[in-house]
């Protein structure tokens, strides 16, 4: 079997790229080790929650995907309040100030995945999907790439796109070097029902034990991410539901009153990943395979969707290109994405180091910085414009 492009990894970013190339003259294969998971019939909530920027929502809308998500499972954010760790410092951002109807949207991973896979499986057109398929070897040669599957099938391609996550097997096979360090933190995620209405406000607290974020869900519900050191994270995941709810409520200064746990807490390790290059001849990296950032800014998925948008525009613009794995063509993608990725890596890593420091002088100045920025509309406006764009 031969294709122009083979995407390895069918998560949100990989499936989005496949969908964005649907209907083009390109022949595309999407390979994923897992099988598509149908949405549950009950009203339960997914622990994996994404903050989707207006730009990402517009991109998904242009693909005909955003409109298909169940509107009752999408919550707009109208305001965001951020607090320092001295009990007084804070900064707030509002949609009204940004000139937009909302700052962002909150929705579940499984809602997005269901829409993406539905679009691919129900009307595949030029896309061939290999689900429950494991890649075991890749061999590069001058005229293309061979991918060997565990069942013995061989797939040929002009270009491989690695979209297989932060511990990318494709990246390793390509020999791309990585700057990779653990933050020695776990992101503890869970969903709660709340006593008080959230009024579509997102909250974030920079605390001495980490960063706690509240994202609004429909009705009186929130999703939380508590990025904290490993010992504390393990403790939080092993106490009773009642005690965990109490701890989160106290850490948030009871801003939404009493909390009741509605999904069991889960945890994921936090890592910084910077790749030496995004492309090689016949290879492109996108999403978490191309970058790994701290979740304190909630921008990981948006960074990946911007990868998808840039790459799909380049590939579709050159649909009659003689060789989609040509290094000169692929360098256009790297040039288009490098500055954005580097800036986001630098900002999120810097913020983590700044707010993770226990130095009393640094603590004083970071809290002062929050307060002063909140009092300077011009600077705050510039920060908002950069984040929203």
Summary of predicted features, one role per range:
Residues 3-30:
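N-terminal Rossmann-like FAD-binding beta1-loop-alpha1 element of flavoenzymes
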Residues 44-84:
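N-terminal FAD cofactor-binding segment of flavoenzymes
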Residues 60, 146, 159-258, 262-265:
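Conserved FAD-binding catalytic core of PHBH/FMO-like flavoproteins
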Residues 232-327:
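FAD/FMN-dependent oxidoreductases across multiple families
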């Amino acid at each position: 079997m031969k294709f122009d492009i083979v995407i390895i990894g069918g998560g949100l970013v990989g499936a989005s790229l496949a969908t964005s190339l649907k209907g083009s003259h390109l022949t595309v294969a999407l390979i994923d080790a897992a099988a598509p998971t149908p949405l549950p019939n009950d009203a339960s909530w997914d622990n994996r929650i994404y903050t989707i920027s207006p730009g990402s929502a517009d991109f998904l809308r242009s693909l005909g995907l955003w409109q298909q998500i169940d509107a009752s499972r999408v919550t707009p954010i109208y305001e965001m309040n951020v607090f320092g760790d001295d009990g007084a410092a804070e900064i707030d951002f509002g949609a009204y100030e940004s000139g937009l109807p909302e700052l962002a949207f909150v929705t579940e991973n499984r809602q997005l995945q269901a829409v993406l896979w539905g679009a691919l499986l129900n009307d595949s057109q030029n896309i061939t999907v290999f689900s429950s398929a494991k890649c075991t070897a890749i061999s590069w040669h001058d005229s293309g790439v061979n991918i060997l599957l565990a069942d013995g099938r061989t797939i040929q391609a002009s270009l491989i796109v690695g979209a297989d996550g932060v511990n990318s097997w494709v990246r390793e096979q390509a020999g791309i070097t990585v700057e990779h360090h653990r933050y020695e933190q776990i992101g503890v995620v869970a969903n709660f029902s709340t006593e008080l209405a959230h009024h579509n406000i997102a909250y974030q607290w920079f605390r001495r034990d980490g960063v706690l974020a509240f994202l609004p869900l429909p009705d009186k519900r929130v999703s939380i991410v508590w990025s904290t050191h490993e010992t504390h994270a393990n403790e939080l995941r092993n106490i009773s539901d009642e005690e965990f709810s109490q701890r989160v409520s106290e850490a948030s200064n009871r801003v939404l009153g009493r909390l009741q746990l509605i999904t069991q807490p889960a945890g994921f390790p936090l890592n910084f990943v910077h790749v030496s290059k995004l492309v090689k001849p016949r290879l492109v990296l996108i999403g978490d395979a191309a970058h790994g950032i701290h979740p304190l800014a909630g921008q990981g998925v948006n960074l990946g969707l911007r990868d998808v948008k840039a790459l799909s525009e380049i590939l579709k613009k050159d649909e009659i290109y003689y060789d989609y794995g040509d290094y000169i063509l692929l360098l256009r993608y790297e040039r288009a994405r490098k500055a954005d990725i580097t800036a986001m890596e630098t900002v999120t890593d810097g913020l983590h180091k700044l707010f993770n420091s226990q130095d009393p002088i640094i603590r004083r100045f970071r809290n002062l910085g929050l307060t002063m920025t909140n009092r300077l509309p011009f600077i705050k406006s510039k920060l908002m414009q950069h984040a929203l764009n």
